[in-house]
């Protein structure tokens, strides 16, 4: 990886603490980018029917479903969540905090009840729509909805 252990290490001539805090949103955005595009690929018919559908077949979706995946799917997901640490220097303890946050966020968005009422952050309602439509192409993102909006795959909840 591209991790570092001394919190006082400076990159790009930036203050080490400024850089440390800057890497948080940068890592989350990169994770979301890798996840979005790899997740879209997982919804191609042959991959969805043979691999990714294993994650989508469980009803109702719950936090436990976030960890239920085909082993190939799990490894591809791991690429999305670890690739940012290969690309940008990240403080080693922060890497672990971000990975734990990613794990818990996955549990949260599979809860299927919480509505953050924020069109820019992926929430359980949004991800529930993704699971409802299965192979169809909606709401692929993990943290944020910008890639879904840019690529035309965002589907908002219907208000009754």
Q: Where does each model-flagged region fall?
A:
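Hydrophobic alpha-helical transmembrane segments of multi-pass membrane proteins
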Residues: 21, 25, 37-38, 68
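Juxtamembrane helix-loop-helix connectors linking adjacent transmembrane helices
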Residues: 1-31
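Cytosolic/stromal cytosol-facing helical appendages immediately following the last transmembrane segment
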Residues: 42-160
């Amino acid at each position: 990886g591209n991790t570092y252990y001394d919190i006082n290490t400076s990159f790009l001539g930036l203050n080490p603490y400024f850089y440390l805090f800057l890497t948080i949103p940068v890592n989350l955005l990169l994770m979301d980018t890798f996840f979005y595009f790899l997740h879209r690929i997982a919804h191609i018919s042959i991959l969805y029917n043979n691999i990714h559908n294993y994650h989508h077949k469980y009803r109702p979706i719950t936090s436990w479903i976030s960890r239920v995946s085909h082993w190939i799917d799990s490894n591809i997901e791991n690429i999305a969540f670890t690739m940012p640490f290969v690309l940008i220097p990240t403080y080693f303890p922060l890497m672990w905090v971000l990975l734990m946050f990613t794990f818990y966020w996955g549990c949260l968005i599979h809860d299927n009840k919480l509505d953050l009422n924020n069109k820019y952050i992926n929430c359980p309602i949004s991800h529930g729509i993704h699971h409802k439509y299965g192979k169809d192409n909606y709401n692929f993102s993990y943290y944020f909805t910008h890639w879904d909006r840019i690529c035309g795959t965002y589907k908002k909840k219907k208000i009754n």
